[in-house]
């Protein structure tokens, strides 16, 4: 039995889950999500708890058991409390501004970079920049009820200007540590 798969998922007071054929629909204060179920897994809802069982002990069913439970737990948490990801934009003149459903970045290129946010993901830029290692840093917070879409959006934003190892300029996750390198030293 999968150690993760056998754990029950507690649904919050304001979270509703309905099994509709091959998918589970979640509804809560932060929005709606639906999760498609793989063929070898069954879901039951009793007394505000959701349990996931596999149909047989094949390798495929065992691998899908814990994965499906985790995806369902993330959906339940997403519609009740939501998810948040913080990024730091570090560099002189590096800025971000949210305009509607797009983020306008100034990242040291000769042109501004416009990033369109996917459906269900919102962004917020910190009001005042702060200094970290003598570089101005602007905070960017992404929020969504869908953990997968939030992670993909954060990866795509980070790839616009990944942090470089010499000065640490670029876009990085707030909790990420950049391994710094020493510059060239001239010999005399």
Curated annotation (Swiss-Prot):
Part of the 50S ribosomal subunit. GO terms for molecular function: rRNA binding; structural constituent of ribosome. Keywords: Ribonucleoprotein, Ribosomal protein, RNA-binding, rRNA-binding. The gene is rplF. Belongs to the universal ribosomal protein uL6 family. SUPFAM superfamilies: Ribosomal protein L6. Gene3D superfamilies: Ribosomal protein L6, alpha-beta domain. NCBIfam families: L6_bact. GO terms for cellular component: cytosolic large ribosomal subunit. Pfam families: Ribosomal_L6 (PF00347). InterPro entries: Ribosomal_uL6-like, Ribosomal_uL6-like_a/b-dom_sf, Ribosomal_uL6_a/b-dom, Ribosomal_uL6_bac-type, Ribosomal_uL6_CS. GO terms for biological process: cytoplasmic translation. The keyword Cell membrane does not apply. This is Large ribosomal subunit protein uL6. The keyword Membrane does not apply. This protein binds to the 23S rRNA, and is important in its secondary structure. It is located near the subunit interface in the base of the L7/L12 stalk, and near the tRNA binding site of the peptidyltransferase center.
